[in-house]
Amino acid sequence: MELFAKRMTWELDNEEGLSCLFFELEDGYFTLSRKTGAEELRLEMDDPANGQLIDPDCFEYALDNTRFRLNIVRNNRKVLRYLEEHHINTELYGEIVLHYTPLSKPQLEALSAVTLRLFFGELLF
């Protein structure tokens, strides 16, 4: 699914210990978040009812100054079993490409730091 962000914001370890990426879309939103110490990543699309907690090891991601790509790893039996056992909505969260206005180098570095925190928790800090 390709999405185009009108606006995006991010936070790294705010006062509540939350790191998050928020993408405002033309007709909705997409957000990824993780609390410090939490094992799972929360993904939410357009409605809190669509939110799901997912092990970040289920994903591979890539980002550059104009897009963020998120894919569920589908060639790993352990991941596939986890997705099935936890009733993960792979239709909604299986493959997402978010396009956004080009970022400056400092913005990209800040976005990269938040993304590392989301997917690796405290491992890299």
Predicted regions and their residues:
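Charge-rich, low-complexity N-terminal segments
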Residues: M1-T31
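Generic detection of short hydrophobic beta-strand segments and adjacent strand-loop junctions
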Residues: L3, W10-N14, L43, Q52, ...
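A generic structural signal for beta-strand entry/edge sites
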Residues: E16-C20, Y29, A38, C58, ...
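Short, well-structured hydrophobic secondary-structure segments
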Residues: E24-I54
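Generic "edge-of-domain/loop-turn" microfeature
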Residues: G28-F30, G37-E39, R77, K105, ...
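Amphipathic protein-protein interaction modules
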Residues: A49-E109, A113
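C-terminal partner/receptor-binding element of secreted or periplasmic proteins
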Residues: A110-L123
